[in-house]
Amino acid sequence: MSYSVLEALRNSPDVVRKVLTARRMDASLVDKFLELDEKWRRLKKEVDELRHEYNKLSKEGAKAPPERRREIADKARELAARLERAEKELEETERAREEVLWSFPNLIHESVPICPEGVDSIPVRHWGVVKTTKDVVDKLDKGVDYLVVEKAPVGHADMAEVVLKMADTLKAGEVAGSRFYYLFDDLVWLDFALAMYALDYLAQKGFRPVIPPYMLKYDLIRRVLDFDTFKDAIYKIDGEDLYLIATAEHGIAAYLYKRELLEEELPQLYVGWSPCFRKEAGAGSRDIKGIFRVHIFHKVEQFVFSLPEDSWKWHEEITKNTEELIRGLGLPYRVVNICAHDLGAPAAKKYDIEVWYPSQGMYRELASCSNVTDWQSYRLGIRVTRKGMKREYVHTLNCTGLATTRTITAILENFQREDGAVEIPKVLRQYLEPIKAAPKDYILPKAAKSP
């Protein structure tokens, strides 16, 4: 049983150097690890030999005649002192070695593009007809189907707050700060309908619905994400050993912490719903208007625990699931393969699914689908026992089902009418029908009510 990054470091260090270079990281980290690993292996051998010698001497002392026992006891004390020093040095070296090992990102799949400066992803496929103004046509990806319109539609922020009057970020800013919001009336029902649509669809695909804990202890949160990079992006509960999750993925991954599984127990498929809490510390002034990029949003998430040999099949499958959900809504989208330098540390490969925003004349990220291979399971100690008692780390994968809050913004832009009404995608109507107060076909502008 071996962690793939550790195995590559020991057997193919040049491969890891290439990965770090492709990710635009310092490749000298490999040499730092190999030096510590060599020291650790030398000390491990020394400790094992000293223990063997000490045990042998102890047995010899028990059988020795009285006149030799003092001599053997003196040797045993000397050996015990040497063993204690060696064990302490081994422990310190192991801790330093593990710290460096944990700082390595995942290896990358051969299909991950290595991109030049200024390019973060490569389009893979497109679906749907994008509505665009003439000035944007030349900027579209090659082969995209488009329909030229006279003027760009109203942006999602103004649609929600000015036209429909069903969101209020100004008041939320007063009471909570920027990137918070109040959502009202039909947009609330739309959020719930989107969640039910995604949960229902994925449950029918065999995914087990779950609402995970919204907080995790430090020892778990550091195992499920690249904590050193993202510690400033997630919320910590003051005075508590707890962090708010940034996605349901975190809580679901932790569910099988330290579990030993049998082959027949895999795959395990989960579809989680949760609020997601993010500081958006690096966002600056980007997307400051509306509810596109906020501190709290709702999301349905796919998560898979897989046999190692099946994970790439599952990566394509969960990406396809999300495409089908977005296609069902009728939103034009593209799938892009994320370049090596833009991959998060856990991912061996990641697709983003980006939906067309006609007011901006561009595609924007709506979902991400990653194969994390054994990067997460190594840290969480989740293994599978194979036939012949061979043990391996399972592979984990995650993929957005629907980020419902952001999906609302895409619906507001793509399905608005001249009179300010917004057509509700047909697939959502069955989830709205049982609710008497909910809209059924259209979301109509409504006069704002005074607080």
UniProtKB/Swiss-Prot annotation:
Signal peptide positions (record) = none
Q: Which domain of life is it from?
A: Archaea
Q: Does the keyword Ligase apply?
A: yes
For this UniProt record, the keywords arranged alphabetically read as follows: Aminoacyl-tRNA synthetase, ATP-binding, Cytoplasm, Ligase, Nucleotide-binding, Protein biosynthesis
Q: What class of enzyme is it?
A: ligase
Cellular component per GO?
cytosol
Q: Which organism is it from?
A: Pyrobaculum aerophilum (strain ATCC 51768 / DSM 7523 / JCM 9630 / CIP 104966 / NBRC 100827 / IM2)
Question: HAMAP family attached here?
Answer: Ser_tRNA_synth_type1 (MF_00176)
Please give a single GO biological process term from the UniProt record: selenocysteine biosynthetic process
**Any matching Pfam family:** tRNA-synt_2b
Location in the cell reads:
Cytoplasm
Protein name, entry field: Serine--tRNA ligase
Q: A Gene Ontology molecular-function term?
A: ATP binding
